[in-house]
Amino acid sequence: MDIKRTVLWVIFFMSAVMLYDNWQRSHGRPSMFFPSATQTAPAAAAGGASGTGATTTTAGEVPAAAAGAAPSTTAPAAQAQLVKFSTDVYDGEIDTRGGTLAKLTLKKQGDGKQPDLYITLFDHTAGHTYLARSGLLGGDFPNHNDVYTQLNPGTTSLTGDQNALKLSFESPVKGGVKVVKTYTFTRGSYVIGVDTKIDNVGTAPVTPTVYMELVRDNTAVETPMFSHTFLGPAVYTDAKHFQKINFSDLDKNKADYVTSADNGWVAMVQHYFASAWIPQQGVKRDIYAEKIDPTLYRVGVKQPVAAIAPGQSADVQARLFAGPEEERMLEGIAPGLELVKDYGWVTIIAKPLFWLLEKIHSYIGNWGWSIVLLTLLIKAVFFPLSAASYKSMARMKEITPRMQALRERFKSDPQKMNSALMELYKTEKVNPFGGCLPVVIQIPVFISLYWVLLASVEMRGAPWVLWIHDLSQRDPFFILPVLMAVSMYVQTSLNPTPPDPVQAKMMKFMPIAFSVMFFFFPAGLVLYYVVNNVLSIAQQYYITRKLGGAKKKPA
């Protein structure tokens, strides 16, 4: 029994350490176990054959000034304005300085009835900066520091009979080039069309490069206590797939990612929500990510444009996603975009679990009851393994008095004590590890479900019953955490009492320690653990009673 408990404690300890290590990596700190790519391989030189490595690749000519910054003192001052707009999914503001998306509120998250659930994704205030901007490189061309003029000002709201809203902004002429930037907002869509028309109004050919970037600070938003998720830039290409970039690596100029591709996208990821520039596929572009201010970072692409003769123009089309990390929707927008909803190392198990949770919800219509039913189905699938574990625990409980007697008898001779215990196990046909393996097999599934519930924006604002109005927030009255503590205490009391007094005290202390931590967990997560514990108690009670009845029957 001591061996089994030791194994379980080792598993518990390792799980706690791995969760802490994941928290470390999610916050941009180095892993305790896994070196970053920059520690294991030298970064490739800019323009090298591998196309990866950011130690020598920066944004180059991309201006670093944030939107809203004062124009150069050598240029005549121009007054920028904020153009407000509204659609069925967005309320936002476009800054005429650069034609930059300076504010974007996702009002559909509140379904128009719960303003407290609205999320402001893009913003530019004294305390928070998060922008989507673009411009030209390759000469003294218009960029995000120049003041644009709104074309055809008028309707800035999506009316009932409109399917799309277009807002266009024209730059001043610089370097013989004029830019017209058009945003297209489509009804019901979180994908914004961004068309950059480049007119050569000069007398010589020009070869500009379009840059598109996301700029933000490292301030976390809507992150549950004790449940930290990734915040920062990300890059996706066919060659390297999904690559997260930690802010700490950008601080040290040691980030490692693909810097050249003709496919994929760049993104800024946070809990529940993301934004991503998605250039045209098949068009060569450079990728960059860097720190541009003590608290500001950016990730973007630079896409060269073929030479434009005088009097001619060129169009560069791209898409800008800004919305919730709804897995099915993301899959239909761009290859790999669903990976911004990051399950980490348990993705292979978590994705099928979320698919099943979605299917259940499509029939039930309530995410809380869907969690309950999914937990019930998982427990049913693992019932044979759980039964084997509980049977082993019941048999160990029966022989515990004899084990204690042997320990007392041979306490001065550990070798004889171990031999006697092994002989007892052999005689009674008990495997001291019999209860461990079934538990170990189930651990990845339960960890996966934890990450599914933590990462799914569908839980945000989703009610369950009575006092639970938002499964992504903590229980306002702490009823579920109390039930969690009670269920853990009952479950612990059903197990054999450890012979070691220290272990016995720790087993009694665990429900209290866990309940304190779960007081701050999202209600959906606590609901899952409560249901899982209650079902485990029912299983253990049933199997123990069944074994007890079977033993009495022959007598």
Curated annotation (Swiss-Prot):
It is found in: Cell inner membrane. It is a multi-pass membrane protein. Belongs to the OXA1/ALB3/YidC family. Type 1 subfamily. The chain crosses the membrane at residues 7-24, 367-387, 437-457, 476-496, 511-531. GO terms for biological process: protein insertion into membrane; protein transport. It comes from Burkholderia lata (strain ATCC 17760 / DSM 23089 / LMG 22485 / NCIMB 9086 / R18194 / 383). Interacts with the Sec translocase complex via SecD. Specifically interacts with transmembrane segments of nascent integral membrane proteins during membrane integration. GO terms for molecular function: membrane insertase activity. Required for the insertion and/or proper folding and/or complex formation of integral membrane proteins into the membrane. Involved in integration of membrane proteins that insert both dependently and independently of the Sec translocase complex, as well as at least some lipoproteins. Aids folding of multispanning membrane proteins. Keywords: Cell inner membrane, Cell membrane, Chaperone, Membrane, Protein transport, Transmembrane, Transmembrane helix, Transport. InterPro entries: Membr_insert_YidC (IPR019998), Membr_insert_YidC_N (IPR028053), YidC/ALB3/OXA1/COX18 (IPR001708), YidC/Oxa/ALB_C (IPR028055), YidC_ALB_C (IPR047196), YidC_periplasmic_sf (IPR038221). NCBIfam families: PRK01318.1-3, PRK01318.1-4, yidC_nterm, yidC_oxa1_cterm. HAMAP family: YidC_type1 (MF_01810). This is Membrane protein insertase YidC. GO terms for cellular component: plasma membrane.
